[in-house]
Amino acid sequence: MTSIQTFTSFTTSNCYVVTPENNSDVCYIIDLPPDVEPALEYVRNNNLSIGGCLLTHGHFDHSLGMEKADGKIYINLDDEFLARNPQEQLSAFTNSELEVQEYTGELNDIFSFKNENIDIFSNPGHTKGSISYEFKNLGVVFTGDFVFAEGIGRTDLYSGSLSEMKDSINNIFLSFNKDLEVFPGHGNTDTVNNILNYNSYLKGFING
């Protein structure tokens, strides 16, 4: 059966295990936080196979679990440096003493990933390589740190851009079907329609 399971990290980032098709044991993991183990345990306990680990961007709270992950990892290669070098980010996010090192495993270009039921959107702003994933048969979109239910991603970190965020909101987010349910990188879900109506941060970026 189709399902979306949410696992929230101690970093507050959301990891999702998505089983998009009935009568299929193939799942997709959206983002790989440092403590990704519960998501991987869910996959094993339910005898699922991983069709791909799809990263929304390269920040450590969404990618530091790459060493632990099974399955091919896909990312916009504009964020490859961020994903491979988490030590460059930690001081900007947290005072915790996470043990990190450069990731040397394989990273696959997200634009080489092919699935007719999954649309891939490039929405730079939070990072240069930020991506959203729409699972068309489920009526949902995973936005990472692009847009939240009550906010938008910050743009003052490495490769972030305020002007690109504005362009992405107007050209990508406004193109989404208003009935889509948004599953963000942090916080709760909501519909595109509700976010457009009540997210004051996002509304400030919409062209008049």
Model-found features: residue ranges?
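Conserved beta-strand hairpin/beta-sheet module of binuclear metal-dependent hydrolase folds
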Residues: 1-46, 132-144
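Conserved N-terminal boundary motif of the eukaryotic protein kinase catalytic domain
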Residues: 118-119
